[in-house]
Amino acid sequence: MIQEQLAHLLEFLPDYRPFPPVKEHTAWQGLPLRAKQRFLQAGEAALQTPIAPLPLSLWLDFTHTGRRTPWETAYFSRRARLCALVSAECVEHKGRFLDEIADTVWAICEESAWQLPAHNSYVRDTPQLPLPDTTRPIVDLFAAETGALLALTRYLLPDELDTAAPGITARMERELDARILTPYFTSHFWWMGNGEEPMCNWTSWCTQNVLLTVFLLPTTQQQRKAAVKQAAYSLDCFLKDYGADGCCNEGAQYYRHAGLTLWGCLEILSNVAPEAFRPLFRETKIKNIAEYICNVHVEGPYYLNFGDCSPLAGRCGAREYRFGQAVGSDALQALAAADFRADADPDHLQNPDGSTHINLWYRLTTAFAEQELMEYAAVPQHRSAVWYPSVGIYAARQGSWVLGAKFGSNGDSHNHNDTGSITVYKDGRPFLIDIGVESYTKKTFSPQRYEIWTMQSAWHNLPTFDGVQQLPGAEYACLLYTSPSPRD
C-alpha cells in the first residue's frame, strides 16, 4: 500500500515544518492562553528541578535485578524536563529558560546510550547485553524518541541555543547523526520490517520519530529519499499484520503507539510529499485503524481491555482529532474533542507509561489544535455492537451495560492467556474487570513471561478445569460456532 505511492514522489523533498520556529513569534503569541499558562507553569517547575543523574549503577540495577523503573524514571525525567523548558521558552521567548535547556541537551548528548537497558540487544527477543556498546548505537523506541526531541528542539531554537551555548547545535547534529541517522541507514533493526515477520507498535512508533529527525534536520536529499523508501517498506510490514477491519491486537493503550504513530508517519510523509502520500488517508483500512479507538471506548476514561492493555488507556486529544480529520471520521473527531475538554492533564504530564510527556511534537500539536478542540461541538456516539473478526474482539452495548469479549487466540502482541475472557461495565463503571499488567520488568518480555500471575488464564474471567490453565500461542484459540454480528 505505502510502497506503491513511491512512484509518485517528486524529485525534491522539503523540510517538515510542523510549527514555526520561535523567531517567528506571532504564531506562538496566538496560542490559547490556557496552553501558554500550562507551558510556563511546567517550565518554571522544571527550573526548580535538577537534572536527574544517570550513573552506571542504575543501568546495572536492571542487569542484576531486572527492575526497569530505577533507570527509566531518571531517563524519562531528563526528557520531560527538556520538553517543559523548550515549551516554556517557545511561548515566552525571553531567554529565561535557555541556560537550562542547554544544560539538559548537553546532559542527554553526554549519555553513553539512548536505548533503554531493557532494549539493549541487537537481535529480536534475545537477552539484553549487560552494558551498552557505545560504538554500535541501538535505535529502540526511546533512542528514536530522544532523536525527535533533540531535532525539534534544534529546529525551534537554533539561533537562541547557539547564542546561549555557541556550537551546541553542531553537537546536537553530530549526536543525532551518530546515534540515529547512521544506524538507521546502515543497520537493520528488527522493527524496520523483514518480509512476513510479525511487526508491532515499534515499527510505526520508531519510524515516526526517525522521520521527524530526518525532516527537521538539514539532511541531504539522498538521506531524505532513503528514509522515505525505508519508511514505506516498514509501514507496509506493519500494515500487513492488521486485518481490513483495522483492529489493534495490542489494545487501546497501544493504539496510542501503533495506530496514532501510523498517523504520525503519514502526517509527515503527506506534508513533505503530498502528491504521493496524502491519498492514503482515503484508504478504508486506514480509516478503520483510526476509528478502532472509538469502538473500544466505554465511557469517560475507560476502555475495554485485554492483554497488557490497561482499562485506563489514556484520554484522546489532538492526535486522534487530526487523524479523524485526515480520514474524514466525525466519530473520532467528536470523541477526541470531548475527551480533550474533559482532560485535566491535556499535556499528559502524569502519563504512567512515560512515553507521551517526553514527546515535544505531541505537546505542541496539542497546543496548536487546542482552539479547534475546544470549539468542536459534536457529541460522541457509540455503535451498539462491533465485531472485529481479524482479532476476535466483540463489543456490545445495551442500556447501561457494556460488554467486551476476547475471542481470537493467545498469539497476540502483548498477549495474556485470556482467550474467551470478558469484561463488563455498568453505568460507565467497571463491573467485571481485567486487571491488566503490573510494572514491566526484565521477566515481562522473556521466556518466563507466563510465570507472571497477571498473564495466566486463572487470573482472568475464565474457567479453570481440573487445575489446567490456558497456554500461550496462536494455536490456542477460541472456536466460534456462530460469529457475532455487529448491529448499528
Tell me the role of every PLM-derived stretch.
Residues 1-33:
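Extreme N-terminal leader/anchor segments
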Residues 259-431:
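Carbohydrate-active enzyme catalytic cores, enriched for enzymes
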Residues 129-253:
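Active-site lining segments of carbohydrate-active enzymes
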Residues 81-95, 145-164, 206-221, 260-275, ...:
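Well-ordered alpha-helical scaffold segments within catalytic/enzyme domains
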Residues 417-480:
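Active-site rim segments in enzyme catalytic domains, especially the processed small/beta chain
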Residues 481-488:
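Conserved small/polar residues in nucleotide/adenosyl-binding loops
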